[in-house]
Amino acid sequence: MENKVTADYLDEEGCLHCGTCGKRKQMKVSLMGFEHVVSCLCECEVKARQELDEKMQREEAQRQLYQRKSVGLRERRFWEWKFENDNGSNQKILIARQYVENWTDMKRKNVGLLLMGPVGTGKSFFAGCIANALLEQGERVMMTNFSRILNEMTSYQADKNQIIQNLVDYPLLIIDDLGIERNSEFALEQVYNVIDSRYCKMLPLIVTTNLGLNEMKSTDLDTAHQRIYSRILEMCVPIYCGGEDKRKEEGTEKLVQVQSLITG
């Protein structure tokens, strides 16, 4: 049954009332010895204004979220990497969820993650889920890779120091696909500078890579690679995202480590 719309009406004092809620839309006030009729909000108008304010707040929140994602997630495919889109095939997603749930402690304790495993194991997806969840909470996150960073640094009139500073300013930096970037002396120096700058500022870092833990710890590496990987392993807890890990004992130990950090 449709609600009938009742016309506004005047009371015995000549003040207007809302025909729907019955509350005053006008009231009399005395000022400087004179009586004035002034407007006021009835319940319907208060409710309508509140709903409009809430709508505007939601729209502004969506606008700000879009802006944060546009800056922090340059590749549009990252936008769809969300926990609600997970197919449940890899239980390591629980670590990503716990990381987000305990983000305040993770940030305070400077806890990062090193998500490792072959192509197709979901490590980049897990990192993207963390990024999107924190962005939706209002946090500033940058998810990128060193190939993109190095391209920016070698572009015309690029300010390398400013680019590094911009990356350091993010509460969380996610580096996707570590190891695919070029291995020139310049490139390795800049990779180290970015990582070390966040280390010095005690800001968390999440890294995804196809490299194995043994590769990153190998003493056969040159000095440039050794110091990069050593710094990452200082900052990040290794999590193997593949199936059965050949380094099962070490993986279990690290899993306990990150869980203890997450739970306090």
Give, region by region, the residue ranges found by the protein language model.
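Residue-level preference for the first positions of well-ordered beta-strands
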Residues: N110-L114, R140-V141, L172, P204
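Walker A/P-loop nucleotide-binding motif
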Residues: R108-A127
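Pre-Walker A (pre-P-loop) alpha-helix and adjacent loop at the N terminus of AAA/AAA+ ATPase modules
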Residues: G72-L73, W79, N85-L113
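A short, basic N-terminal segment
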Residues: M1-N90, G251-G264
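Short glycine-rich substrate-engagement loop in P-loop NTPases that contacts/grips substrate
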Residues: I93-V100, N132-L172, R182-E189
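Walker B catalytic acidic pair
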Residues: D177-L178
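Metal- and O2-centered redox machinery and metal/ROS homeostasis
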Residues: G22-K25, I93, K107, C241, ...
